[in-house]
Amino acid sequence: MSKSTVFTVLLLLLGMAAYSFGWVQAVAEAAAQYVQIFNNDALRLGLLACIAAVLMLPAFLYLHYVTQSVKNMTAAFQKLTQSHQSCCDFQHHRLCSRYAEEVKSLRDRYKNVRQTYVMAAVLCQVIIFGCMFEIVKAVPFRLHTPPIVSTGMALLLILYLLFYMRMYLLKLFQHGTLFKKILACVLTGAGIGWMLSFTISELLFLIILAAIQQIGSFIYKRFSNRGFTSLDL
């Protein structure tokens, strides 16, 4: 069993224990008391969404860095392979010594991209989101809408999430094992059923948080692309 797997299992067990013993709910209720200082529901939701976005920012930035690094590493590896077409026989695995050195140098350049770090960043986001969502549930909001409105908003949010994950889902159903496909279908169905039970305040919190993260993602991509363009020049 790899270190990342052990780390993931331990964190999941810790999270399940904290939730089952009521520690998460107790902390959420205590935090909700401070949020209730503000009398405006829109201000409460905006404040909670901003706090969640700020707490998730380090993991958010690292995951964007990993995504960009993987793209750059793939492009650099393809360029490296093309430059050694004349001296290496890739079909029969006859490679020159310079190619091996350059591949090692390329790997060292992107050594910060590790599966353990990625898993830790994802779990960090999940834990922070779960805690903030519990705080939203603990705050007594005065927002009331007809069921059709909340159901419609939930469906729009579900469609957005499915569109956001479309590349991963397509890759999974094209190349994944049968077990992974069944697991993905079960988890997707459970997630859709769970989201349809959300209140209007919970849905608005998710929408505001998603909007903040989309804006942050857009800004990050603009600045990172400018940085890479200036490096290329």
From Swiss-Prot:
Recorded topology in the membrane: Multi-pass membrane protein
Keywords: Antibiotic biosynthesis, Bacteriocin biosynthesis, Cell membrane, Membrane, Transmembrane, Transmembrane helix
Lineage, opening ranks: Bacteria, Bacillati, Bacillota, Bacilli, Bacillales
Function: Involved in the production of the bacteriocin subtilosin.
GO cellular component term of the entry, any: plasma membrane
Disulfide bond sites: none
Cell compartment(s), UniProt: Cell membrane
Signal sequence bounds: none
Protein name stated in the entry: Antilisterial bacteriocin subtilosin biosynthesis protein AlbG
Transmembrane segments: 4-24, 46-66, 116-136, 145-165, 192-212
A biological process from GO: bacteriocin biosynthetic process
